[in-house]
Amino acid sequence: MAIRKRTYLSVLAGILCFIALGWWYGQFGRPVRDVYDDSAKKRIVYRMYADYKKEFPGVADISPKRALKLLRDNQILFVDTREPLEMRISMLPDAVARETFVSNPEKYPDKTVAAYCTISYRSGKFVEKMMKKGIRIYNLEGGILAWVLEGGKIYDADGETRRIHVYGKRWNYPATGYEPVW
């Protein structure tokens, strides 16, 4: 009798482990990013950004939707604050590297300037430093992740791309149809 009970408990424990692992890996083997639809990913990305924003509360934000409108009107300059490897995977339209902007911020007097990174934490810190120097610059709310989730396009050296550098597993929330890289 004790053996049957132990066998029963072992089988039950195995089933529970299987269920837990299935949940952990995102519905039985599917990557977590595929479990969520884009509206859920938006909520996650904007919630993460709101948490990060607490570290630079004085920084002015610009929403991806507002930035898209300014892009259509050719009135925005994007400053990519990510590392070169990330920028080689994809960038926002006509973005310049942080170093390029810092070397001559006066070069863009007629543009709204918006910095970004994966989720706009690093860019938020960058914007904070630039604001202390008297430079008017915004932080793209939610970064490149929110940008593609709101319908913005990204580019590599060959043109439009569906690859997006998400920095790491924690930020693996690309829009549907995008291939995450980290």
Kindly give the residue locations of the regions a language model identified.
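Short hydrophobic beta-strand that contains or immediately precedes a catalytic carboxylate
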Residues: A67, Q75-R82
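Flexible, charged surface loops at secondary-structure boundaries
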Residues: K69-D73, P105-K111
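A short, well-structured juxtamembrane/interface segment
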Residues: F56-R72
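Gly/Ser/Thr-rich loops at beta-strand to alpha-helix junctions
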Residues: T118-R122
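Hydrophobic anchor at the start of a short beta-strand
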Residues: I76, V113, I137-Y138
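Rhodanese-like catalytic fold shared by cysteine-dependent sulfurtransferases
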Residues: A2-A60, R88-P109, G124-W182
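Long amphipathic N-terminal alpha/beta scaffold segment
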Residues: R82-P84, R88
